[in-house]
Amino acid sequence: MPGLNLTRDEAIERASIIKRVHSYHIFLDLRTDQDVFTANVEIRFDAQEGASTFIDAITSSVKSINLNGEELSTDLADGERIQLPNLAAENVLKIEAEMFYTNTGEGLHRFVDPADGEIYLYSQFEVPDSRRVFPVFEQPDLKATFEFEVRVPSHWVVVSNQPEVKIEEKECGCGRANTWYFKPTPRMSSYITAIVAGPYEKITSELTNSEGRVIPLGVYARKSLMPFVDAEDMFELTRQGFEFYEEQFKTPYPFEKYDQLFVPEFNAGAMENAGCVTYLETYVFRSKVAEALRERRAITVLHELAHMWFGDLVTMKWWNDLWLNESFAEFMSTLAAAENTRYAKEAWATFSASEKTWAYRQDQLSSTHPIVAEIRDLADVQVNFDGITYAKGASVLRQMVAWVGQENFMAALKVYFDKHSWGNTVLDDLLVELERTSGRDVRAWSAKWLETAGVNTLAVEVENDEAGNISSLGIRQSYAEGFETLRPHRAVIGFYNLVDGKLTRTDRIELDIDGELTVVEEALGKKRPDLLLLNDEDLAYAKIRLDERSIETAIKHLGDIDSSVARGVVWGSLWDTVRDAQMPARKYVDLVLNNIGKETNSTALRTQINNLSATLHSFVAPEAREETRHRAADRLWELACVAEPDSDAQLQLLQAFINQTRTEEQYDNVQRLFEGELTLEGLDIDADLRWNLVCRLATGGRFSAEQIAEELENDNTANGQQYAAQAYASIPTAEAKAEYWNKIMVTGELSNMIQRYAIAGFKSGKPELIAQYNEPYFEQIEGIWRSRSHEISMQIIGGMYPSEPTAELLERTEAYLASLPEDAAALYRQIAEARDGVARALKVQAADI
């Protein structure tokens, strides 16, 4: 894997030689066998005469290389790059090659549908994987037009960035085939080009944009999955997104069509290929899902649409400005949801519960980095698709918009798009427009917010007189060791009082916070409320420390706060105090169990269940862990039983109970649910919930391999195969664990998605069953990192890291990190993040008294 790297210095040097890439004409023959396919490419580009460079191409074999009419030796190709000597001022390069299909979700992924045996293909190119499909100058600033010609079996469809211009049917050596010809694209980076091919089915619609242009819309999925696709919901969200973005940006949608395709075994949530967006199939709901997942799908739809402007129309020059793509798309998607969709009421509460929780966690790891990160090479950027680039960046943008004003912000974006359409930008290109429209010193703001790392803590310091009126109120700002930056914050202080059983806001103060101590003069003389909520409305990006009186009010009445955003701020503040070892873990467990039954925001409920699980596994003192887990599972069962029938809460609480099942009595309830002897009103044991029960019963030794095989026979679908892998790997026997250790760590035979589920199964159950694999993990992981693809190795590095946070594991991990060579920086980062988790867990365990 490291041999496939490209450094920033190499990219800069190549861009100085390649003056302009004009066009690619790419022919792909996708009728070939399951291992390789044919790719022929013609590239026209200008270069420094007499210079030499290289083109990226991860190939099975190279048949021919022709540069300006001269046949070059195929020895110039090493399977990763093709050297190009003695360039002319104007060049025509023709290459014929065979490329590999993958089962890792990188390059051109090949999937066989178990339901009907049909073959489906899709491309995934970000960051550096268009080179797995055709020879290409794989860096974002070498833009060009791309014209695709694709030959496929006659019953397939092909979708790309542009509309097809014709389809030719021919009788070929291996049967009838169709060749699809597509219009050339506008100038774009290679990583947002796309090819999706197979017997996909589609549903079509259209919209008329702000220019009066009719934009064709399409939603695609596998034949066996299409009955579950909610195309109307996708179209509704797409129309709402188009309307909002074109109005805000004053810039029309830049492409000719907008297709959205659900593709199998996709690694990410989605990918913003220009006019041809791909999504993971988890967003097709064949069973009932939490409303949190429906809202996540909506945010993802809006996120990818925002990328058509941020990233596709205007692209970062190099990957250090990846945030110009991702932070903006993340922020704009929530803003669009809040202002122009049915998710308006809950959008920012969801953002608080999901994105900001992710950001705060990532920003407190040793691997944290500025939003504008230092990216030395591709290995750096591949591990920087993280909570800083996405979630912190979006959080900070929200802070910026509150500071400069939304109208000024959007006006700056219009000029930015006008100036840089189809080009590449750096940070300063945006800052100059923001300063012009707002009159603010945005560069100084950027230096503190975008170019430094770490999260500040804002703590309330309040006193009142004998009458209960506030006599002093200050906000004290601090920073973590090693991150000595105090930042400006725009924030709201909410005054909440109990009114008719609800904690209701009765007053608010909006202010700028800066420096070590900000005195809030406006609060003096006001009645001290039951809850003084700093960062109400969640504008600021900071850890929040409430005063003791407010903490006690929150613990007793968290579920009674009538604002979902305010509840989210309180949930987040209390979670931070646990993670920082300032609240005993068992007290937090009680807090969650006493309040989640009243939580109405689906994503907040999901987040608190996840935090509860992490606390039970890692933060509760070891001597109290089993008893606390038993008690928590019992309480989750009680909450599920009394939840409103057929409600989101009922489903989430039941799934939480299933995942926390420990005792024989608890397993009995799971067994009876599976067998239909026990029912909850309004609850249907549908396909996915049935598999949840199967996986847990397998973990408890109550479901055999033979029974799993029977379940798979009844649900031999992509979903069924994934769940079956998890169930098999969950069986609590040495033989089952050894079998899946071998499949994951040794043979590498599993596809990306099957491996993901298998890892979850392998790690389930009693930790002593897999403790024997702790040392082999450290012995094998560097070899896996060096030999497997990025996506596969990242799954294994994080997923197979030893489970139990102990002092021995911390010591072993530190020793391993010290032994790693300098060229293993990306591996070091992933292991160091796992180490950070162990160190934090031990600190929190020690405080759980």
Predicted regions and their residues:
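Surface-exposed beta-strand/loop patches in extracellular or lumenal glycoproteins
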Residues: 42-59, 138, 147-153, 474-494
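Extended, low-hydrophobicity, Ser/Thr/Pro/Gly-biased non-transmembrane segments
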Residues: 3, 15, 98-206, 374, ...
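Long, ordered, helix-rich scaffold segments
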Residues: 387, 467-470, 483-485, 498-505, ...
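Beta-strand-rich binding/interaction modules
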Residues: 61-67, 442-443, 453-534
